[in-house]
């Protein structure tokens, strides 16, 4: 699939699924705004790799929980390339809670996670919608999680935020049609630094092995697996909107450990 001259904003685009999607789009000649909040080095590295693959890039720092930052990210993209064809809301945060006690999460924890995972995605959609509506077309893909479907994951606050993102995706799909399609991917376990940083190498290796043994497809999902789903919804699925596409090697079918991205 070619994405020649497609202009796409990817929040949280310097690492993980966002970086994998940026590289995939770059191979087809896309123009990509790579947003990051704190991972400046990783964002610059991803941008350089995209350029080597034939893509054009703009690296843009910004916190999606800040509405001014969201509007600036979109404005800088339009200033550079004149339009926005796609938005991938991939920026996200969580809080790992090992304790089963309800006291392990505070109201502030919930609000912090919601401000990034839900409000941030909404603010980016709101910022980009006028440009897409004016040109008569556009596509938004939200990176959700199987946590929002199954009520599992790193914490109740995280799972609840992804459930809210799923509902918001459907609401935005209704509101922004027919010009703009809005969909989401719901990854299961994803290999990479999120779990590695939390568990250490030994614990991470055990988790990957456990996932591979327990899910129906015997496969631990990679950032590239999720990027394929996201790029499909973003660019090729003109008849699909309001869809939550689960990509979890069958974890949601049951018999899987209670883990998620």
Question: Language-model features: where?
Answer:
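C-terminal substrate-recognition "lid" of short-chain dehydrogenase/reductases
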Residues: 2, 122, 219-247, 252
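Alpha-helical segment proximal to the catalytic Tyr-Lys
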Residues: 130, 173-178
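Residue(s) in the substrate-gating loop at a strand-loop-helix junction
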Residues: 145
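Short, small/polar-rich loop/turn modules that mediate ligand/substrate recognition or access, typified
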Residues: 177-181, 240-242
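Conserved glycine-rich cofactor-binding loop
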Residues: 7, 12-16
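Substrate-binding pocket helix/loop in short-chain dehydrogenase/reductase
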Residues: 70, 98-102, 106-111, 140, ...
């Amino acid at each position: 699939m070619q994405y020649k001259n497609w202009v796409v904003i990817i929040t949280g685009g310097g690492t993980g699924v966002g970086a994998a999607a940026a590289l995939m789009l770059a191979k087809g000649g896309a123009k990509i705004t790579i947003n990051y909040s704190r991972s400046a080095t990783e964002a610059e590295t991803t941008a350089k790799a995209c350029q080597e693959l034939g893509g054009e890039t703009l690296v843009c720092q910004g916190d999606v929980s800040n509405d001014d930052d969201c509007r600036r990210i979109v404005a800088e993209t339009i200033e550079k390339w004149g339009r926005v064809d796609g938005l991938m809301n991939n920026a996200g945060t969580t809080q790992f809670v090992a304790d089963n006690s309800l006291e392990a999460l505070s109201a502030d924890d919930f609000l912090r996670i919601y401000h990034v995972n839900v409000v941030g995605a909404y603010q980016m959609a709101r910022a980009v919608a006028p440009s897409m509506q004016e040109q008569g077309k556009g596509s938004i893909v939200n990176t959700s999680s199987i946590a929002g479907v199954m009520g599992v994951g790193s914490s109740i606050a995280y799972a609840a935020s992804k459930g809210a993102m799923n509902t918001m995706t459907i609401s935005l799909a209704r509101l922004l049609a027919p010009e703009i399609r809005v969909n989401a991917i719901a990854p299961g376990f994803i290999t990479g630094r999120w779990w590695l940083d939390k568990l250490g190498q030994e614990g991470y290796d055990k988790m990957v092995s456990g996932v591979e043994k327990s899910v129906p497809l015997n496969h631990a999902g990679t950032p590239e697996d999720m990027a394929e789903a996201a790029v499909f919804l973003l660019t090729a699925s003109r008849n699909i909107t309001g869809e939550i596409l689960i990509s979890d090697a069958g974890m949601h079918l049951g018999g899987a450990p209670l883990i998620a991205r």
